[in-house]
A protein has these predicted regions:
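Non-catalytic signal-transmission and effector/linker regions of two-component phosphorelay proteins
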Residues: 1-16, 29
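CheY-like receiver
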Residues: 56-139
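Two-component/phosphorelay signaling modules centered on CheY-like receiver
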Residues: 22-46, 86
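C-terminal output/effector regions of signal-responsive regulators
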Residues: 143-144
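Conserved sequence signature across two-component system core domains
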Residues: 18-19, 48, 66, 96
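Helix N-cap/capping motif at the beta->alpha junctions
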Residues: 47-53, 77
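Switch/coupling loops of ABC transporter nucleotide-binding domains
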Residues: 13, 43, 91
Length: 144
């Protein structure tokens, strides 16, 4: 995932889906693709079976939007979101999980939304709309 100045490869919105349940990851990725087609947004949707796999891929680029499960083997989705924030990344985080216990922790990592499984298209689309809006408002950062 090579990123441009505002995130995304040459204007392509990079969306990462991270869920250890293959069926859930495929459903969420499919909904994200449906959202992009419906909005006329060019997007690349990648799936990852663990937070560790997504962390490893950060060397290739940071996603614009991360759709994260929370409870996974190894690092949790919440730990991944905290790491992204510690690194200063502007990745827009949406939690899609069946664990309600961490809903308030989402505020600590400035999550766009916290959705319960099974993912509903209307709620995921609204969360992706919000994430895209936030990305559009992001101020460019100069690192020297």
């Amino acid at each position: 995932m090579a990123r441009s100045e505002r995130g995304g490869e040459k204007g392509v919105l990079q969306i990462a889906v991270c869920d250890d349940e293959r069926a859930a990851a495929d459903l969420i990725a499919g909904l994200a693709r449906d959202w992009a087609r419906g909005r006329g947004v060019e997007a690349c949707v990648d799936t990852f079976a663990s937070a560790d796999a997504l962390l490893f891929s950060l060397d290739d680029g940071v996603p614009d939007v991360a759709l994260l499960d929370i409870e996974m083997p190894g690092a949790s989705g919440m730990e991944l979101a905290r790491l992204l924030r510690e690194r200063g990344e502007r990745t827009q985080v949406v939690f899609v999980t069946d664990i309600i216990d961490h809903v308030f922790d989402g505020y600590d990592v400035d999550a766009v939304s916290y959705l319960l499984k099974p993912a509903r298209a209307d709620r995921l689309f609204l969360a992706l709309d919000r994430a895209r809006e936030r990305l559009g408002r992001a101020e460019p950062v100069l690192v020297v």
